[in-house]
Amino acid sequence: MTRVVLAAAYRTPIGVFGGAFKDVPAYDLGATLIEHIIKETGLNPSEIDEVIIGNVLQAGQGQNPARIAAMKGGLPETVPAFTVNKVCGSGLKSIQLAYQSIVTGENDIVLAGGMENMSQSPMLVNNSRFGFKMGHQSMVDSMVYDGLTDVFNQYHMGITAENLAEQYGISREEQDTFAVNSQQKAVRAQQNGEFDSEIVPVSIPQRKGEPIVVTKDEGVRENVSVEKLSRLRPAFKKDGTVTAGNASGINDGAAMMLVMSEDKAKELNIEPLAVLDGFGSHGVDPSIMGIAPVGAVEKALKRSKKELSDIDVFELNEAFAAQSLAVDRELKLPPEKVNVKGGAIALGHPIGASGARVLVTLLHQLNDEVETGLTSLCIGGGQAIAAVVSKYK
């Protein structure tokens, strides 16, 4: 079977809700990475067979945001593109689709990843197409409803985390401690420049003066403590344990990489970072969607012909501390190998981009001692996706 490799994996900094990227459309974040990857590799843009980009909150952006990003990123009109929506798994699903297209011989080079600007998601006025006869009307927050609401139970994703906390007996203190650890790891990594190799700075033009250049993730917080987090009120249930402090944020960002056949990489003298070994997807009861990575990880390992003990580093999306702790318990993961640079609770969770973001961060950790990695994300609606990669040799 054709070996599929990953090269030139990058991401933007992750912006906080209403932060530096509030006026930068998702497709511009994606275009920035596409332009950088082409420049970095020296690849002829016309060599790219297809562009596949995850993006969840598409309303108001225009037709096919992936195509917009591709064109604005400097790719010729002849390169096709399409947009993927598998909620939080969109970015990784895009990479899986690229992988599948290469294995089947349809493509040789695909630009794949994810992008999201949650700050720009519009408010909707449903049932207004043909006017209102009388009475009050309300708006629907497309970010909350299309991105963060379990449609089957009509409640926020945070309730699914509360369900897991109850089912697994995960305390508020355990969740807050997990969140503090995530922040501390991210602070340390950021201060040590450990994200520098994966981040492409984003220049934002201003009406007056020089552009603002964003170089670091905005959500990383110093001086966070369990004591401080314990003062926060529950966000989703009056007597709940999930808070804004032990959940991932609402964020903006993008991540992208080249997915190639090994033969094409050799032909073009592009040095791969890793080999894609296999993927796994899984579904569970939507009310406990956060536990779905357990099944996805097991399937990805089986298809990769690896055991959990073979994995040197894990990048698992931290949707919620309760959700992450439940998955860690089920899989019995070694904590020293999981999210060693911090996770989404600290870095942020731009939903359509996160699947690619966790893989980008993982790829930049591979070396002679860290040779095999696994990444996974839970997905609203009761799903999950996982991937296993190995350092290219």
Swiss-Prot record:
Keywords: Acyltransferase, Cytoplasm, Transferase. It holds the Pfam family Thiolase_C. One of its GO terms (cellular component) is cytoplasm. Its EC number is 2.3.1.9. It catalyses: 2 acetyl-CoA = acetoacetyl-CoA + CoA. It is an enzyme of class 2 (transferase). It comes from the Bacteria. NCBIfam families: AcCoA-C-Actrans. PANTHER family: ACETYL-COA ACETYLTRANSFERASE, CYTOSOLIC (PTHR18919:SF107), ACETYL-COA C-ACYLTRANSFERASE (PTHR18919). Belongs to the thiolase-like superfamily. Thiolase family. This is Probable acetyl-CoA acyltransferase. The lineage of its organism: Bacteria, Bacillati, Bacillota, Bacilli, Bacillales.
